[in-house]
């Protein structure tokens, strides 16, 4: 998911486009108490659909979801480094608010986020 000042979007990889989920600035939900995140131009929120690994409540499914998010997080960090963009992988965020705002299913869990911006 992509959280911008004007709205929150789902990235559609097949069509390489963003689909608006909700209008409005929800960077505060991503911030998890860290004010700098509210000023980042964009935040990428990594969601894992644990039902893809079987029982969404099982420890194994949760581990697999966390591992997938970690792999994607590393790729985001590597790309940002190559593109001279600033980012930091974070796990603190308002999970319950993000679940509502992004209209997530019960099996979908916010795992990590990456605020992305320019170096100061």
Describe every region a protein language model picked out.
Residues 1-120:
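Acidic, surface-exposed loops and disordered segments
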């Amino acid at each position: 998911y992509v959280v911008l000042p004007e709205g929150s979007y789902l990235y559609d990889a097949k069509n390489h486009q963003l689909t608006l989920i909700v209008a409005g600035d929800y960077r505060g939900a991503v911030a998890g108490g860290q004010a700098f995140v509210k000023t980042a131009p964009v935040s990428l929120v990594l969601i894992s659909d644990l039902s893809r690994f079987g029982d969404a409540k099982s420890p194994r499914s949760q581990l697999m979801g966390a591992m997938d998010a970690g792999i994607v997080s590393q790729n985001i960090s590597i790309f940002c480094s190559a593109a001279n963009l600033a980012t930091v992988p974070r796990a603190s965020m308002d999970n319950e608010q993000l679940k509502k705002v992004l209209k997530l299913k019960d099996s979908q869990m916010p795992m990590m986020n990456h605020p992305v911006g320019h170096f100061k």
